[in-house]
């Protein structure tokens, strides 16, 4: 089957490193991962052949492939990785981004291109994500580690819905920040804010990908 006829989520799982390519093209491989690559490219007027070539090159060369194959890792190892690499990182990222955003809004609020509203949106994401991470760490992940797979089914569905909501919140951030593209004369804080938001989005998308496309399906398929 050609890459064009595969879902974004399937490609993100089968080709480690593909997530980086998808982010470059602003292709949603986590919350919108059920869309075929061909359809997603058409929706955004992207060059499908170019994307397929990059995926082929990545698959063949394994260049930049430092991603572990989580499809066969133990649940405990995967969960510990998610908490250490993503949960803890998000808790560090968001307060700093809020501080930077407040500075930019306070100093440049009179400019037409100032991202007014990004502080409130980041605070919303921080509040909701903090609750989400806590529920995973205190309820869902212990269930999975203890092998209570049937009980984990409903919490997983709730987490997936919250992932969708987080994806929608990210789209609002992109809209407010011109897809995280600072103006040519942006100050250091403005540039640092957008760079930090981009990093946060990269991390969040990969975080959701690991759960939605690998961890959760594995648990739901347990007999």
UniProtKB/Swiss-Prot annotation:
Pfam families: Hemerythrin, ScdA_N. GO terms for molecular function: iron ion binding; nitrite reductase activity. It comes from the Bacteria. CDD domains: Hr-like. Coiled coil: none annotated. Keywords: Cytoplasm, Iron, Metal-binding. Gene3D superfamilies: nmb1532 protein domain like. One of its GO terms (biological process) is protein repair. It is found in: Cytoplasm. Signal peptide: none annotated. GO terms for cellular component: cytosol. NCBIfam families: FeS_repair_RIC (TIGR03652), PRK10992.1 (NF008221). Di-iron-containing protein involved in the repair of iron-sulfur clusters. Belongs to the RIC family. This is Probable iron-sulfur cluster repair protein HI_1677. It comes from Haemophilus influenzae (strain ATCC 51907 / DSM 11121 / KW20 / Rd).
């Amino acid at each position: 089957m050609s890459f064009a006829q595969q879902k974004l989520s399937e490609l993100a799982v089968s080709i480690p490193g593909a997530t980086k390519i998808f982010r470059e093209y602003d292709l949603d491989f986590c919350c919108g991962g059920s869309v075929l690559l061909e359809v997603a490219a058409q929706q955004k007027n992207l060059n499908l052949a170019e994307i397929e070539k990059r995926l082929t090159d990545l698959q063949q060369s394994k260049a930049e492939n430092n991603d572990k194959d989580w499809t066969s890792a133990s649940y405990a190892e995967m969960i510990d990785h998610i908490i250490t690499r993503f949960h803890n990182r998000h808790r560090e990222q968001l307060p700093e981004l809020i501080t930077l955003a407040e500075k930019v809004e306070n100093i440049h609020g009179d400019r037409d291109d100032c991202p007014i509203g990004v502080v409130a949106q980041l605070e919303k994401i921080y509040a909701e994500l903090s609750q989400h991470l806590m529920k995973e760490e205190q309820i869902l992940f212990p269930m999975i580690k203890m092998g209570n797979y049937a009980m984990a089914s409903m919490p997983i569905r709730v987490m997936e819905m919250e992932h969708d909501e987080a994806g929608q919140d990210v789209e609002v951030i992109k809209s407010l920040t011109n897809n995280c593209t600072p103006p040519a004369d942006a100050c250091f804080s403005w540039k640092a804010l957008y760079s930090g938001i981009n990093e946060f989005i990269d991390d969040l998308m990969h975080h959701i990908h690991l759960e939605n496309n690998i961890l959760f399906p594995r648990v739901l398929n347990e007999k």
